[in-house]
A protein has these predicted regions:
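A short N-terminal interaction module
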Residues: 1-25
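Amphipathic alpha-helical coiled-coil/heptad-repeat segments
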Residues: 489, 526-573
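Polybasic, glycine- and aromatic-enriched phosphate-binding surface used to engage nucleic acids
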Residues: 303, 310-536, 543-545
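Short, well-ordered loop/turn elements at secondary-structure boundaries
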Residues: 53-54, 89-94, 128-129, 133, ...
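Conserved S-adenosyl-L-methionine
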Residues: 27, 33-142, 206-209, 219-220
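Signature of N6-adenine DNA methyltransferases within the class I
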Residues: 26-27, 31-40, 63-70, 99-104, ...
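Glycine-rich, phosphate-binding/catalytic loops in enzymes
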Residues: 75-79, 111-114, 167-171, 219-222, ...
């Protein structure tokens, strides 16, 4: 294992030293895709019998029982008939991999049956079955496919930590995007994408977690740098597999090309084989506006979202709106306006540092704003203080000059010294984890509780320092009541909903990383009337009035029906 981790293995050496694999398909994340879903994916990828498929190359990286392979073989057969070819002309048209010998044997039998049923001879069918299907690990193949036209399939859904240690290390060495607590399918995306020729297409049905979570960031960065996201189809409620799965699946169609327009589709539970042709036709038509049927909705974006950050989620119309706002407006956190998003002070020992009374020098008690102080929508201080070890210059105080503070900390020395921050800096055992910024205390700030169902900005006019369960916004230019009105609106809520993880009960995390995603107009571009309307709505905690004013400010009055969620109703939460 250490040898694998410590050096790059030669291609053949890598697989020969690895642990034997289980013959149980379930342990390999094998879930069978329904035939109509397979046909939908092949249609969307452009792997269709009207093309001369014998001249192209398609890869199925984890063929399992052959759900995709059978359909692909049938299409190659039909294509050869249509183009007056021998089926043997297609000997290089398909390459399928699987780790398990029984799956390889089953797939070869399936291919033979498909081809003989189509009228090809048994020797021809057997030759192609042998050529098309091979036992091997797609992620570690010493001669990986290159310059292929299609990579299609349903890659295995297995946590990387559930793979034997030596094989896991080999996967990480072969696939740099597989970081953190990655799932195995991330490697299939990476290897599949890198196999494509210019213009080649990858089409997978797979869990959609990688689009938003931390371990998918390097894959998102790879896609953004060299590939085009042509299509995403959310299939959360669709019966796409032969058995129930816990993951939320999506179909993604990626192309080795510069990013162009992208289509986003959301399906409903009723979406089935009868609806697939209509969906394919609407996508091929490149409709510039949103399309809606009884079983799906679709919208066309002018481009996809870039970088390694989480890709937004939501209805196609919501995503189209967010894409438009991203293009037209600057980010909330903006150096040109001195607008900054931050988090309150973390102590590592709130029972010691956060109190309503402590026998210390009075100047060491810093008024602290808490989540409960924001509950009503008006800032109402609950009387909590931070027993503050930092002076007015942000330097740790010398306890020899503060006997009462020293005595207080020493009474709690056991709790303070067992914190990680104290272990790293024994001479500063009484520090908080975060340094206090003295300049922040008297600044007006908008406060945001960490967890809430709807966005909940509250104005602290100054004099308090935020606790770590509060995020804050300060600005050199914005009137914070006007900005507070914008951030109380359904537009701001839509940004957070698109990027944040929603917890049980509908609670959202209003963390700095999500608040920074919000786009806002330039302060000077807002009319006096709209400034007054936003400030009045903020003071009244009227999120519906705030949303109405925000729609005008953003120039999206016609899209008010997209904001029927929690932030669109009267009052805060």
């Amino acid at each position: 294992v250490k040898a694998i981790a410590g050096r790059q293995l030669a291609s053949g050496e890598m697989t020969s030293v690895l642990s034997a694999v289980s013959a149980n398909p379930v342990e390999h994340g094998e879930v069978f895709t329904r035939r109509w879903i397979v046909d939908l994916i092949l249609d969307l990828a452009g792997f269709t019998a009207d093309r001369d498929l014998a001249t192209l190359v398609a890869v199925e990286p984890a063929c399992g029982g052959g759900a995709f392979l059978a359909a692909m073989a049938g299409r190659v057969s039909a294509s050869c008939r249509k183009h007056d070819r021998s089926i043997l002309d297609a000997k290089s048209a398909l390459r399928a991999f699987d780790l398990l010998g029984p799956s390889v044997a089953a797939s070869r039998t399936l291919v033979r049956n498909v081809l003989t049923d189509d009228g090809w001879s048994l020797p021809e069918a057997s030759e192609l079955a042998q050529a098309w299907v091979q036992q091997g690990d797609f992620l570690l193949d010493p001669q990986p496919p290159v310059n292929v036209d299609f990579v299609v399939g349903n890659p295995p859904y297995v946590r990387l930590e559930d793979v034997p240690a030596d094989r896991m290390l080999a996967y990480r060495a072969a696939c740099p995007t597989m970081t953190g607590r990655s799932d195995l399918y991330v490697g299939f995306y990476e290897r599949g994408l890198k196999s494509l020729r210019p213009g080649g297409v990858l089409a997978f049905i797979c869990a959609d977690r990688w689009m938003r979570n931390q371990y998918g960031r390097h894959l998102r960065e790879l896609v953004s740098s060299s590939y085009s996201v042509d299509l995403t189809i959310s299939m959360h409620d669709v019966d796409a597999f032969e058995e129930q799965v816990s993951a939320y699946p999506a179909i993604t169609v990626l192309r080795r090309a510069a990013q162009g327009a992208s289509t986003v589709v959301d399906t409903r539970r009723s979406f089935g084989p009868q609806d697939a042709p209509e969906l394919v036709e609407s996508i091929r038509a490149n409709a510039p506006t949103a399309v809606s049927s009884g079983s799906f909705t679709a919208a066309r974006l002018t481009h996809w979202f870039t970088g390694e950050g989480p890709w937004p989620t939501g209805s196609p119309s919501r995503l189209a709106l967010i894409e438009s706002l991203n293009d037209r407006f600057p980010l909330l956190e903006d150096r040109s306006t001195g607008t900054r998003v931050g988090i309150g002070v973390a102590t590592g020992a709130d029972k010691v540092f956060v109190t309503k009374y402590a026998d210390v020098e009075p100047r060491r008690l810093l008024p602290l704003s808490m989540v409960r102080d924001t509950a009503s929508g008006k800032f109402e201080w609950s009387g909590h203080y931070l027993v503050n070890p930092w002076d007015e210059d942000g330097v740790l105080v010398d306890l020899s000059w503060l006997p009462r503070l020293r005595a207080y900390y020493e009474r709690h020395a056991v709790a303070l010294k067992r914190r990680h921050v104290a272990g790293r800096r024994p001479g500063q055992w009484y520090r908080t984890i975060d340094r206090v910024d003295p300049a922040l205390v008297d600044r007006p700030k908008l406060l945001f509780p960490d967890m809430k169902s709807a966005i909940h900005p509250v104005l602290d006019a100054g004099g308090y320092y935020p606790h770590h369960n509060l995020y804050y916004i300060v600005s050199d230019v914005w009137d914070l009541r006007v900005l507070g009105g914008l951030l109380l609106s359904g537009v701001a809520q839509a940004f957070v909903e698109a990027y944040a993880v929603r917890m049980r009960g509908g609670t959202l995390r209003f963390q700095a990383q999500y608040l920074r995603r919000i786009r806002v107009p330039r302060p000077g571009s807002i009319s006096l009337d709209d400034r007054a309307a936003l400030a009045t709505a903020f003071d009244a905690r009227d999120s519906q009035a705030a949303t109405e004013a925000a729609l005008r400010v953003y120039g999206i009055e016609a899209m008010g029906d997209l904001f029927g969620g929690p932030a669109a109703g009267r009052g805060g939460s």
